């Protein structure tokens, strides 16, 4: 098992699709190696950005098996296994636990059902008690319709098979988690714009969408922070923040995929109900990213911040 100990920049990786709509494994391999070289030191596969609701059970198993072999222990891999059915989550997580190279299971707060805090506590306790993989809680109220309160997270953090959380909430809540977590419980932000602040507060890092397109700058930001170059780190975060926001101006992951396509790293295809960006939307996105309006119709470099002054 590859642990999260030194993993601070993890990408919630997209699932590339071919023109025919199947998973594009050569593109996934190319993108993964690019991200590793750019400074990523962990991945979530089959998460929100991976369009997991549109993947069949067999596709997920095939995807996770392929990805585990590809990474081969170089960095930790977290696979999405959660659902709003506790028994189904247990069964699928135990199936994924048999896949070599998968280190953790990402289990989302159950969407749609809208359980209360007692229900969330019971759900995660039941899953953690019954599965082999250590769990990462995924608290993303904007998508699930309910929020796991900090007190509930801290109760679950004491469970020996719950290893951490991907938290999409306020900085105040993040700070409370960091201050009160038990030893060994990892706290990651799922909000790119919080990437620097959460590290300053003592968190473990970010599970990122923007790292697909801005990994060198995000790695440089964290390296600057570690070296005590706070002005450099802050400057990079200020440069990144509007670009991070732009990557969510249309339903994710369509903006990220549009940029990856222009970089030659993957196609821009999404699965319905997420649509590929139109030509007009690509122009709007390019402008918001600080690029010429026609930039996404051409070829972009793989380093979008090349030449950025950061000293």
Curated annotation (Swiss-Prot):
Organism (species): Limosilactobacillus fermentum (strain NBRC 3956 / LMG 18251)
The UniProt catalytic activity note for this protein reads: L-aspartate 4-semialdehyde + pyruvate = (2S,4S)-4-hydroxy-2,3,4,5-tetrahydrodipicolinate + H2O + H(+)
Q: Per the UniProt entry, what are the Gene Ontology biological process annotations, in alphabetical order? A: diaminopimelate biosynthetic process; lysine biosynthetic process via diaminopimelate
- Extract one GO cellular component term from the record: cytosol
Q: What is this protein called?
A: 4-hydroxy-tetrahydrodipicolinate synthase
Its lineage opens with:
Bacteria, Bacillati, Bacillota, Bacilli, Lactobacillales
Q: Where is this site: Part of a proton relay during catalysis?
A: 48, 112
Q: What does this protein do?
A: Catalyzes the condensation of (S)-aspartate-beta-semialdehyde [(S)-ASA] and pyruvate to 4-hydroxy-tetrahydrodipicolinate (HTPA).
Cross-referenced SMART domains: DHDPS
Pathway assignment reads: Amino-acid biosynthesis; L-lysine biosynthesis via DAP pathway; (S)-tetrahydrodipicolinate from L-aspartate: step 3/4
Its localization reads: Cytoplasm
Q: Name one GO molecular function term.
A: 4-hydroxy-tetrahydrodipicolinate synthase activity
Q: Which gene encodes it?
A: dapA
